[in-house]
């Protein structure tokens, strides 16, 4: 689709508060407004209803639905976004109540629409399309003529801004093809990860809330050339680059897709293969926008999602970014260790950050003597790159090397230890 599709999109944002507080709903709606802005729409008004449970037919109560219809017509609204997940029948019923010129989408459909706009790699585009076919397409069934008449738009775009396929006859076949292609890509990613493991280089993943400055930091440290915009989910595909630490060691640094509150589990699952970069990292940098008043809750969201991914036990370094803009909530660090303050935009504090990364990667190091056969010289290269070699003695069929190594490197080379501990947990 051309860009004119989203021009003139006037939207209303709707939230139903069934638990939590009105303040929580307002914070979430403010975030939804930023999502809509990223997708190219304009928020005209917001509506919040307190209700014990959502209405089965229209999510809103009948009186509130009628009120919404009045304000939609009065303000010439053509898109209504609900800050929740709507069923296909609820979307149909709401659109019938609001008029045939109004489209209704939910939070997941909006996020997927942004993903579709920003996916750059082949794998990213396939992941987005598969997620849309499983979630968005069933909510658009039978609307082909209507979408064509309305010009598609936010919530209906596929990767590359093509209109999303909604033909029921093609869906299951396309889903199977995408699942097979993505499984092959995931296997290739695992193969590449194994090859990186053999290099002995430590892996550090930058994770955190969307728009916290993850891509800006990777660009500053590695000249990665990643698009870094002041928009939500500007980066969707993970990018890995080599980064040199102060002591000369080279690590692999990865920028990952950002997190957001109320990120549906089906979206987490859809991007599991790329999020595995965080699961398999030796150290996580949790990036935080220090200037954001919601920094504390954003850390909690990030920590909860990492726990869901199985990365909750990873070593963590909290990186409070954008400190040149001021620190909104110093209390966000309460009870947390390993905290650094930087500005990825100006470079302030970045050298100290690199030094701390180096320290954390090598905590618990000890001196070990390895006996390396002459035909395994690649092992010697791993030691020189990732450890401190103190002594080397060449023999007829092997080399004995004494080096100071950390647990990660030792785990790779334990088989060559001349005096290994009886149990690996004795390290």
Task: Describe the function of each predicted region.
Residues 1-111, 417, 421, 426-427:
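N-terminal accessory targeting/assembly segments
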Residues 1-13, 33, 134, 138-212, ...:
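C-terminal-of-GTPase-core extension/linker across diverse P-loop GTPases
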Residues 109-128:
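Short alpha-helix plus adjacent loop in nuclease-associated cores
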Residues 189, 196-202, 220-250, 260-270, ...:
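Switch I (effector-binding) loop of TRAFAC-class P-loop GTPase G-domains
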């Amino acid at each position: 689709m051309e860009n004119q599709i989203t021009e003139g999109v006037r939207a209303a944002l709707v939230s139903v508060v069934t638990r939590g507080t009105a303040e929580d709903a307002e914070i979430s709606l403010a975030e939804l407004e930023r999502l809509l802005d990223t997708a190219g729409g304009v928020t005209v008004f917001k509506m919040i209803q307190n209700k014990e449970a959502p209405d089965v037919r229209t999510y809103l109560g009948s009186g509130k639905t009628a009120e919404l219809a009045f304000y939609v017509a009065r303000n010439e609204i053509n898109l209504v976004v609900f800050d929740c997940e709507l069923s296909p029948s609820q979307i149909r019923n709401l659109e019938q109540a609001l008029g045939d010129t109004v489209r209704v989408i939910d939070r997941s459909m909006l996020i997927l629409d942004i993903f579709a706009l920003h996916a750059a790699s082949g794998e990213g585009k396939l992941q987005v399309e598969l997620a849309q076919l499983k979630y968005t397409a069933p909510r658009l069934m039978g609307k082909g003529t209507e979408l064509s008449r309305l010009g598609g738009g936010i919530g209906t775009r596929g990767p590359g801004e093509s209109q999303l396929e909604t033909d029921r006859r093609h869906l299951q076949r396309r889903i199977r093809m995408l699942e097979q292609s993505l499984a092959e890509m995931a296997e290739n990613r695992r193969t590449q990860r194994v090859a990186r493991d053999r290099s002995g280089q430590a892996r550090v993943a930058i994770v955190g809330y969307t728009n916290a400055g993850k891509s800006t930091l990777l660009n500053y440290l590695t000249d990665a050339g990643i698009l870094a915009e002041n928009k939500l989910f500007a980066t969707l595909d993970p990018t890995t680059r080599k980064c040199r630490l102060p002591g000369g060691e080279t690590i692999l640094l990865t920028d990952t897709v950002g997190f957001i509150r109320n990120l549906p589990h089906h979206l987490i699952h859809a991007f599991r293969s790329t999020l595995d970069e965080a699961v398999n990292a030796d150290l996580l940098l949790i990036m935080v926008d220090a200037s954001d008043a919601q920094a504390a809750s954003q850390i909690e969201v990030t920590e909860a999602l990492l726990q869901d991914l199985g990365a909750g036990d990873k070593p963590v370094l909290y990186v409070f970014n954008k400190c040149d803009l001021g620190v909104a909530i110093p209390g966000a660090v309460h009870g947390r260790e390993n905290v650094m303050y930087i500005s990825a935009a100006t470079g302030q504090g970045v050298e100290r950050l690199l030094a701390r990364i180096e320290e954390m990667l090598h905590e618990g190091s000890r001196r070990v003597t390895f006996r390396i056969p002459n035909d395994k010289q690649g092992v010697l290269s791993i030691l020189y790159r990732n450890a401190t070699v103190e002594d080397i003695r060449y023999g007829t069929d092997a080399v004995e090397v004494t080096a100071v190594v950390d647990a990660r490197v030792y785990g790779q080379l334990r088989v060559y230890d001349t005096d290994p501990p009886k149990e690996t947990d004795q390290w």
